[in-house]
Amino acid sequence: MQFMSSWAADDNRTLLHFSKSTLETFRQHVQASDSDCEAGGLLLGSVHGTHMLIEHATVPTAWDKRFRYLFERMPFGHEAIALARWTASQGTIRHLGEWHTHPEDNPNPSGLDRSEWNRLSAKRRDKRPTLAVIVGRNALYIELVPGSGQGSVFSPVE
């Protein structure tokens, strides 16, 4: 499968670009077989006006809860990486959002996904929307979720 690196919001006002290493992390955790559990982590990168460069995706840790149809990220490990990147970059690299896998070709968010995204977005200190990515077997689902109201869904840019 080939995941695209550049994406645009449905209104074309926001662009995203995923680094090669971020896309490789997604590829390594696709739920290709019936026994594969969901995986996920944080999305770290930089903000450029309304646009974002996603430079790193943390990988599941031993503390995370992973099941076929559920991933629960525990703070241990992920937050330490985010803080280290933020400190080393003097605040340039920040926590932009979260990613996780679904065992389906073309993923869509569940009700649980939506409620979790809304909760995470509402508690952000910087008041920016949360970037939410679901990695399917053949495609990505990408949405920028504000603290309240409707989010922006992204499509690949050729």
UniProtKB/Swiss-Prot annotation:
Keywords: Antiviral defense, Hydrolase, Metal-binding, Metalloprotease, Protease, Zinc
Residue runs in coiled coils: none
Observed phenotype of the null mutant: Deletion of the capV-cdnA-cap2-cap3 operon (plus neighboring gene Q024_03603) results in about 10(4) higher titer of phage PaMx41 in this strain.
Stated consequence of mutating E38A: No change in defense against phage PaMx41. Increased conjugation of cGAS to cellular proteins
One Pfam short name: Prok-JAB
Entry binding sites for Zn(2+): H100, H102, D113
GO biological process per UniProt: defense response to virus; proteolysis
Enzyme category, top tier: hydrolase
The organism's place on the tree of life at top rank: Bacteria
GO terms assigned for molecular function: metal ion binding; metallopeptidase activity
Upregulating conditions: Part of a CBASS operon consisting of capV-cdnA-cap2-cap3.
Record-linked InterPro entries: JAB_dom_prok
Residues at the active site: E38
Enzyme Commission (EC) number: 3.4.-.-
Family designation: Belongs to the peptidase M67B family. Cap3 isopeptidase subfamily.
Function noted in UniProt: Metalloprotease priming reversal component of a CBASS antivirus system. CBASS (cyclic oligonucleotide-based antiphage signaling system) provides immunity against bacteriophages. The CD-NTase protein synthesizes cyclic nucleotides in response to infection; these serve as specific second messenger signals. The signals activate a diverse range of effectors, leading to bacterial cell death and thus abortive phage infection. A type II-A(GA) CBASS system.
Name of the molecule in the record: CD-NTase/cGAS isopeptidase
Organism lineage string: Bacteria, Pseudomonadati, Pseudomonadota, Gammaproteobacteria, Pseudomonadales
Gene: cap3
